[in-house]
Amino acid sequence: MIKQRTLKNIIRATGVGLHSGEKVYLTLKPAPVDTGIVFRRIDLDPVVDIPARAENVGETTMSTTLVKGDVKVDTVEHLLSAMAGLGIDNAYVELSAPEVPIMDGSAGPFVFLIQSAGLQEQEACKRFIRIKREVAVEEDDKRAVFLPFDGFKVSFEIDFDHPVFRGRTQTASIDFSSTSFVKEVSRARTFGFMRDIEFLRSHNLALGGSVDNAIVVDENRVLNEDGLRYEDEFVKHKILDAIGDLYLLGNSLIGEFRGFKSGHALNNRLLRALLEQKDAWEVVTFEDAMSAPISYVRPIAAV
């Protein structure tokens, strides 16, 4: 059978919060079967746990934020994208601050951490959510859709009228049965416009943002000396974000997601619309891994 997965070992990292600019201590820990991904604010007394579920999303302005009462965890999407890409079902994410560290602005460092900790299969069936019919949400000219698909596919289109984007690929469609999340998506960094960063900083946001953890674009060009990691890094980062946002369903998806100018808010609206329409999806497991439309990298020993 396709089994649930957790981490083999505990692993720690330190980074800065994108918005606070302050140091954050991150610890990833194994968790029992059926726990899911749980964010844990260990700087609070008592400690507060917030499960990574669509219904716990409270803010979506600049990132996806989980909220429980007056406690929050910002910027969960890149870490969740890494968890989804490596098929991690159960883990505790301990944080010393209200924000996941931004690292280099991609999911790459989180993939490295998880692979360094090692993957541990557990004695329980992995559950998938299979899309049975189309579910769509729209807002102005933005659109997000789930469609049936025998596998996991993410298609995205961005539309920026800006010199850096003109003539550059603004669409991408990735079928993960034939494309590696780790190689082709995980290293795509978040991006921002210099004018927006200046505005955000004046409101005490993006205080930790820099060319070390984002692609920064001015009126005419990319300011990062090393340029882009992928020719289509901008749209691939939107795919990375979407994968993280979709993992708030609590299970891996069998289906296709299509986004046109979608962001964290619309992605979350789509999840909630899907969960409300119980005839649009079903939970499935696979006793025979060969019959499954999705496969994951084999667990590797911790190094």
Curated annotation (Swiss-Prot):
Its EC number(s): 3.5.1.108
Cell division in keyword set: no
Cofactor requirement: Zn(2+)
List of catalytic residues: 264
GO cellular component: membrane
Reaction(s) catalysed by this chain's protein: a UDP-3-O-[(3R)-3-hydroxyacyl]-N-acetyl-alpha-D-glucosamine + H2O = a UDP-3-O-[(3R)-3-hydroxyacyl]-alpha-D-glucosamine + acetate
MF terms (GO), sorted A to Z: metal ion binding; UDP-3-O-acyl-N-acetylglucosamine deacetylase activity
UniProt pathway annotation: Glycolipid biosynthesis; lipid IV(A) biosynthesis; lipid IV(A) from (3R)-3-hydroxytetradecanoyl-[acyl-carrier-protein] and UDP-N-acetyl-alpha-D-glucosamine: step 2/6
Keywords: Hydrolase, Lipid A biosynthesis, Lipid biosynthesis, Lipid metabolism, Metal-binding, Zinc
GO process annotations (BP): lipid A biosynthetic process
PANTHER family per UniProt: UDP-3-O-ACYL-N-ACETYLGLUCOSAMINE DEACETYLASE 1, MITOCHONDRIAL-RELATED
Family according to the record: Belongs to the LpxC family.
Official protein name in the record: UDP-3-O-acyl-N-acetylglucosamine deacetylase
